[in-house]
Amino acid sequence: MRDVADVANVSVSAVSLVVRNKAGVADETRQRVWDAISKLGYSVSDAQEEVRSPGVGLLIERGSMPAMLDIFYGEVVRGFQSEAQRLGYQVHLHMFDRHAETSSALRTKLASEANGIVVANDGDITPEMIMQLEELNVPLVLAESYVAGRRLPCVLGDNFTAGYSVMEHLLAAGHRSIAILQGPRKYSSLNDRLKGCLAAAASAGLLIPPHFMPSPHSENPRKGYVQMKELLEADQRPTAVVAISDKTAFGAMEAIKEAGLRIPDDIAIVSIDDVSESAYTNPPLTSFHIPRSEIGVLAMQKLHRLISGETEVPVKSLVYGELIVRESSAQKLY
């Protein structure tokens, strides 16, 4: 109903919300839409029959899909999708495969089907690609990613604080021999978590040696298991480990038990994400809770305001989390 949107001087998505009697539109805007429908000679039933839900694109790298569906990003997506449906949008999920698709083809596809785009996570979706998406002049919001030096609206978990908090927790328990199972550097969220860990260690005068920070094995689905095995095979064994994500921690815990060691008596372990499985590991995993569903909801709300033509100052929004202490780090050293 582009003609109604033009007469009412609103977005097509606003017309859709009004006709479908959805929330998210101011009373004054709602009245303008109905006035335009009347002026153009449409009946209510005509308008409801003709209007189609506006589309929003959700873009994520294909490599993230197993983790997205099983652990972390499933909740981000569910939050985004439920809020999109509440606001009257149809979600077009697009998984970018860098081996099978060019960034040019991606831009063409998204421009044809979406009134706005949310990019969830980064990784293979590089800063250069995001800047190219900006050139489409379509509302764009980032979730759990950002581009340094670009004032793009984004919604993030408080990843630096998460890293700082889990490391500080181990330091407060008396640990000084602490390893970090880091993640791939192409993810800004994981980089911020690592920076937080190192900042907390530096504040305590602790330097993490390189051999206590094994590199991730990007192509191996059991990254945490492989990294922990590498640590356990070294001459010196840490008394505690920070895993950069719960998925990494699950693999690390398996390797520790396989080596005949006890958690936390021989090695304490903490992590970041606090997915539902974390409370049911043996022992239950200490983890910093990232409000994943809320990130998706807030990203969609921000995108809706942009699509609706509202003035939106581009800000980097951080969603607060909290440390959930469980038995995996319970032992104190004296």
Question: Can you say where each PLM-predicted feature lies in the sequence?
Answer:
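Hinge/beta->alpha junction and helix N-cap segments in small-molecule ligand-binding domains
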Residues: 28, 62-75, 93-102, 123, ...
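Alpha-helical recognition/docking segments in bacterial nutrient-uptake
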Residues: 53-168, 172, 231-233, 247
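N-terminal helix-turn-helix DNA-binding module of bacterial transcription factors
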Residues: 1-52, 333
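Flexible loop/turn connectors
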Residues: 225-334
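Short acidic/polar active-site loop segments enriched in Thr and Asp
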Residues: 11, 43, 115, 176-178, ...
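Short beta-strand segments enriched in small/hydrophobic residues
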Residues: 14-16, 50-68, 177-184
